[in-house]
């Protein structure tokens, strides 16, 4: 264990020895979680699929393992001074409960916009909370500063050998629960869980393939593997906030690069579909990052036409805002190819709708939106229930054959998040530009937006969509003159919100411009 405290790059044998020794200590706080068979999904995918229920830990996530492993290994002098961490999520609760179990002081620095439910959860586990900074980076900088001035030990969320070894205890349990696994799928944020699982499985059962799974919009490990070293992402998506990490850890990268057998990237819709599978199969309500491993498993099976394999994924956590489920319920059908979203152009004349309805036939229409634009043609937004990708292609082919122009919007995020609710008609102002923003869910956010952007330029479209997360999505259009671009870009920089120019979006072009 001493090697893991002092050596930033321990050997595989050092890790294995530490994981084995921690196998008793970690359970002073954590519990052995079940590896549960997913019967319905196994039948559907023609493989035996198990899910590791880390949502059943006392803090409802695997993070307790790594936090307790490191904190319990500190010297008496370090324990007396207490521990400090920066987190707005599961790591914060893991550190707080670990410290409480060991009778230590724990200070958790959280961003000022952290939802009260997360702050209360940390306090409920005995942690002291300091709200500081506008984002995680500022909170982390403050935590490191305080760790030095108060002589407290900083507990990192993933990039420390003891944290990695603590997460590896999960793999020891899996080997005891199902001995003949062929694949294990592990979500990757900072890489601590994947590194800990992979290094142990490759020691005892090297034939098991360990596959890392990342969200497409926060794939920091995949970016590092392509570059050959850890690198900063320009932007990370926040739906699966538990894996929204800008840069993979140095040690976790070293281990993942060496021991992982492959990577799978999934999108938010695929994660939503996996969340639905977890509920339908084992009645578990996972947070988005908690379902990431299962989403990757399903995609990997489809891509590689696998059958008859024994496969496991990790349900890493279940700390989610209840309102997130509204978004999940809307998007899970698309993630399973059970709903097609289409833009269909037809003549603006009597009988066109009837002809369209005959082509669709008895298929279930999930939504239908239309707004008159001109007397030449009409463009409708329609959702149709489908059995699979093949049926969607069949619908598009049938509509095209009958003289309708069809554009598939199923993968257009602007269409799925905003435009489906904005059938208000087109504008004649060709100087309008459309932007999407990640909007912090905090008091004063809208006021700041309007004070910086709403005084100087006319806002001609505005739609807000909440995910039940720390950030929501806003779609806004501005009427800009040709000379406004430089000043507007400067105002966007002053605003400080993550944004993207989506003026060329297909959905905008079809329905709103």
Indicate where each model-derived feature is located.
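PLP-dependent amino-acid enzyme catalytic core
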Residues: 1-445, 449-513
């Amino acid at each position: 264990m001493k090697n893991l405290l002092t050596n930033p790059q321990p050997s595989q044998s050092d890790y294995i020895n530490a994981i084995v020794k921690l196998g008793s200590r970690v359970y002073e706080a954590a519990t052995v979680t079940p590896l549960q068979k997913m019967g319905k999904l196994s039948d559907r995918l023609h493989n035996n699929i198990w899910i590791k229920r880390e949502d059943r830990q006392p803090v409802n996530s695997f993070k307790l393992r790594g936090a307790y492993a490191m904190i319990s290994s500190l010297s008496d002098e370090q324990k007396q001074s207490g521990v400090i961490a920066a987190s707005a999520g599961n790591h914060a609760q893991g550190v707080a409960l670990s410290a409480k179990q060991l009778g230590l002081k724990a200070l958790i620095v959280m961003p000022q916009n952290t939802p009260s439910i997360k702050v209360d959860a940390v306090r409920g586990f005995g942690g002291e909370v300091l709200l500081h900074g506008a984002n995680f980076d500022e909170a982390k900088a403050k935590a490191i500063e305080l760790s030095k001035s108060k002589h407290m030990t900083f507990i990192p969320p993933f990039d420390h050998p003891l944290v990695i070894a603590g997460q590896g205890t999960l793999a020891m349990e899996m080997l005891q629960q199902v001995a003949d696994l062929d694949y294990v799928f592990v979500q990757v944020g900072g890489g601590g869980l994947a590194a800990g699982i992979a290094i142990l499985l490759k020691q005892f059962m090297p034939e098991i393939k360990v596959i890392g799974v990342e969200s497409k919009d926060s794939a920091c490990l995949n970016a590092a593997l392509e570059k050959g070293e850890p690198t900063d992402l320009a932007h990370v998506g926040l739906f699966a906030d538990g894996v929204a990490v800008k840069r993979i850890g140095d040690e976790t990268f070293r281990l993942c690069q060496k021991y992982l057998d492959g990577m799978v990237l999934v999108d938010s819709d695929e994660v939503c579909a996996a969340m639905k599978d977890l509920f339908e199969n084992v009645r578990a309500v996972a947070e988005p990052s908690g379902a990431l491993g299962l989403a990757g498993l399903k995609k990997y099976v489809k891509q590689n036409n696998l059958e008859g394999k024994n496969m496991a994924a990790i349900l890493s956590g279940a700390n989610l805002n209840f309102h997130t489920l509204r978004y999940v319920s809307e998007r899970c059908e698309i993630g399973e190819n059970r709903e097609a979203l289409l833009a269909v152009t037809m003549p603006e004349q009597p009988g066109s709708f009837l002809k369209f309805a005959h082509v669709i036939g008895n298929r279930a229409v999930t939504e239908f939106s239309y707004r008159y634009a001109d007397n030449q043609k009409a463009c409708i937004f329609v959702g149709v229930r489908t059995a699979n990708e093949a049926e969607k292609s069949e619908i598009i082919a049938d509509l095209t054959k009958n003289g309708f122009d069809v554009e598939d919007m199923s993968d257009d995020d602007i269409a799925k998040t905003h435009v489906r609710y904005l059938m208000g008609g087109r504008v004649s102002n060709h100087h309008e530009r459309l932007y999407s923003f990640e909007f912090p869910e905090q008091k004063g956010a809208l006021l700041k937006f309007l004070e910086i952007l709403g005084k100087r330029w006319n806002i001609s479209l505005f739609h807000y969509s909440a995910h039940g997360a720390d950030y929501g999505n806003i779609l806004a259009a501005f009427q800009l003159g040709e000379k406004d671009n430089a000043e507007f870009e400067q105002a966007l920089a002053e605003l400080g919100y993550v944004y993207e120019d989506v003026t060329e979006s297909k959905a905008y072009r079809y329905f709103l411009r």
